[in-house]
């Protein structure tokens, strides 16, 4: 791993290889950067049979620079030197060579592996190292050095192993750039991204728009140059986000979503300013007729609490969830009226440092005339960006003699034998049906989808008599004995001979690697039969391609890994298992079109930009905005993940292709001849939501209110690759892509769960068209719309909102009941309970109630023992919330100290109540730190009330809690013995103290200070 450090150590970024780090430094114009080769992978503290600890395993692939010399003697000479060296430093592992690839696994401590990797990276005998796995391991899996007998020809004559090695290299090098960085790192560490818990975080977020891209798409002279415009936009955004410490969340057509850590707000602002300047320079360098002269950007910067999570499993995506997403998009849209390329929210202004804020104020920082409720927006003097002017430039644009570098071609004009596999045209009548139980198994679903990749479009055009080869991997369902293998060999030999098929079968410790050769019809038929064979499971098709002649001369050449063979080369099973796991994870996040193109033996970067007519689908959760604003992030993730899983399964089962996910919205496309399949997918999605509501009807669960609308439209799109080696996206763009979102939104007004535009019924079957649709009164862009007829396809928005409000009300009431049961509701302490016996929730306060605690009287019978803090927290969490062990540990330590460091410990607001109750028993505290948490105007008074028994408390740190806006909430009457309340980084700090700080010795606000005047912002 390589680390690039610049700006005197203030900016750090990691890379997997040296070439990538050098390219990034050059692209980002970093002049003071230094590159270091280090490794920061955590190690495991448990030893294996040998009792060794702190061991790590690194698996990587490289290409030999001199394959003509790599014979058995050459490898033997390498073995002699490597054995002596690696035994001396304590590193074990193995090499496996198949020209031109070197596959290596090494095990040892972090220090030893770092030393060996540093020497290996400078070895001129191999190049282009690709890490396949890097993570902790328990004990040593291999001997000291398995190199001498690891030459591929010494293991087995089976060419399937060579095929597997080639597929590893092609899959990782071609598909890695399509993965989100988070998913790529998890795959590298051997983790399944689908199994990772959501990660809450506070982030500075932006939404960057390519100005008037829809007008560009509609221009007849510009549609051909869209493959030049989109990659230029992607290549411009990536360096300015990555170079300032940010992360690109995703690209959606001509929109870039990115985020930065909370302390990188100034870097984000500088990066977005530089993006606008660089695009202006790019436009000035273009010749007449170049579409790149029309690339403008506008963006908005906002701050909020969000959750980075994985949603879906058949087609999954990492996405950011939070109510700030819509606000950030609205801020960006507000820049159209302001005629500026960049706006920032009030919260971002709060986080700016003194120097940056003064600089912006000198440049005319002021509040925008409009307002994005409930966010105030600011702008500063910048080069004017008039959208109307840009639109005029686009309409008057004349490409002249300029031609696109990679022009868009009609899909029908491609050669019939080699079309791009943009549609899943697998013959579905031959596919085995999955039971309902299997469909709930994410692994089975994903493997079933991957198996379809063995039949790309390019293979379908060769006829049934085309000679092909197919390699696939499967797991044995039950232990296989030697008698079982003998039976398999006898039966398969006769069957393959009758079908004129040659086959190689490699069996290694429960893992089958099989290669079939023969005519396409015979091979595909046999493969489908083997998929239904109950003796093996989890079938993964790794490779399929046409061949001129077969490699095998026998109907069945079977190699069984005997104990002697495994003793000679133990890593064989590990190698193949790692391939299967990595391939599964990669396919989940990479577009199916790209994977099919790769499985057909092609380079995905050579995909031809095409224009094609499709049936476009878009579905989203109804009334998702109030749900996301009022539910916790965990509940929002549960809703989205459940919904997206159902959508992707329904779409893939009907032959559709899922595009990039957009929050709760799932876009997809179908072939123009599959309009009926698209409608069936819509019906399955709506039916799933109805069944989900019924299943949770009697349970207080957020999934009991999930409803959706689905829109279908028909039109032309372009499909093009965007980006470079650092980040690549497969984009589906077009007017229909934007219009289908409006059709989906029309479902609320029409009262129909499924709405389709007029071109779609023309492509439906007569039965479905004549009896299953009804005209809608509304339309989109002049096109008539129809709703699917039937009571089960009706959408009652009023009932949906009523159910959502009822769920939220019941959830608050349940939370209030829990607090009364465990004695945490203090609103009724010392008095009678409210009428009706229903306790008062602190989140649902009667009119006129304030945060004042002047009526508080301590209970003399209540024991307050600091040693009980940890148990109090755990007890409250066990009654409804998930236990955060790090908080429990800190509370346990605070029982024996005079300070509690609770800064940045909460993952969500539901943990605040248990923490406040635990703080109450820490009566010996002198310093309390609750910075960077969820303290706001509604709960700060209650927090101070919990501190009343702590008579020695002198300093309370509430820094970096932007939810604090009212000075009245911190008047001295709440807790008179608190000497100092630290408020730096909040909205009620003095003007000179708004910069986020980490020190508790600066920017303090004393409780005895007059809290008027300068302690408020001059809005």
Swiss-Prot record:
GO terms for molecular function: blue light photoreceptor activity; FAD binding. Residues 55-148, 467-559 form the BLUF domain. GO terms for biological process: cyclic nucleotide biosynthetic process. GO terms for cellular component: motile cilium. Disulfide bonds: none annotated. Its main location: other. Residues 825-863 are annotated as: Disordered. Keywords: Cell projection, Cilium, Flagellum, Repeat. Gene3D superfamilies: 3.30.70.100, Nucleotide cyclase. Residues 204-332, 615-744 form the Guanylate cyclase domain. Pfam families: BLUF. It is found in: Cell projection, Cilium, Flagellum. SUPFAM superfamilies: Acylphosphatase/BLUF domain-like (SSF54975), Nucleotide cyclase (SSF55073), RNI-like (SSF52047). It comes from the Eukaryota. Belongs to the adenylyl cyclase class-4/guanylyl cyclase family. The 1224-5/1F strain is deficient in phototaxis. It is not known if this is due to defective adenylate cyclase activity or defective BLUF domains in this protein. Heterotetramer of two alpha and two beta subunits. This is Photoactivated adenylate cyclase subunit alpha-like protein 1224-5/1F. It comes from Euglena gracilis.
